[in-house]
Amino acid sequence: MGEPAFTSFPSPPVLGKLKRNMMPWALQKKREIHMAKAHRRRAARSALPMRLTSCIFRRPVTRIRSHPDNQVRRRKGDEHLEKPQQLCAYRRLQALQPCSSQGEGSSPLHLESVLSILAPGTAGESLDRAGAERVRIPLEPTPGRFPAVAGGPTPGMGCQLPPPLSGQLVTPADIRRQARRVKKARERLAKALQADRLARQAEMLTCR
């Protein structure tokens, strides 16, 4: 009797050797973008912040830690600044001088000169009194004074300005009067809308 023939069966595939990625391509791309953004955020947090208010050009800010030997590095011209400013623009404004229409240099206007233009009688008062008291300007034009024209101030003409709204007192009677006006306006609007609606309905019926 002969020996039985040896039959071999194929072995199952080894799963450990398969390195196939089962993640979809779109999800994998989104994961890579998220990881790159997180890496950039970590790198940005480790760097010093940039100051944008003290100068037009960006420069790093000195970090101040609670240590007695720490000193803030600054320039000599910055020691009197109360808050960061745009120093370049500030210096350009300091270099500018007001000029007249003929090109001649003129001194800047002070508060007293402005008050003398608006109300000639208040030029000699002190600034505290001028700030505390409201300047009363008459609404009616006085003889010899004319209202300002739209083209600009004319030499020899006075300036007529309305009184400031902050100086007018609002009474309960004014509030009630305004409420009555609003109510009447709403009633007129409701009547007009109703008449318009009826006219439209009548027009639609006639068109049919």
From Swiss-Prot:
GO terms for molecular function: methyl-CpG binding. GO terms for cellular component: nucleus. It comes from the Eukaryota. GO terms for biological process: DNA methylation-dependent constitutive heterochromatin formation; negative regulation of transcription by RNA polymerase II. It holds the Pfam family MBD_C. InterPro entries: MBD2/MBD3_p55-bd (IPR032343), MeCpG-bd_2/3_C_dom (IPR025884). Keywords: Repressor, Transcription, Transcription regulation. The MBD3L proteins are encoded by strongly repeated regions of the 19p13 chromosome. The exact number of functional copies is unclear, and some of them may represent pseudogenes. Belongs to the MBD3L family. This is Methyl-CpG-binding domain protein 3-like 4. It comes from Homo sapiens (Human). The lineage of its organism: Eukaryota, Metazoa, Chordata, Craniata, Vertebrata.
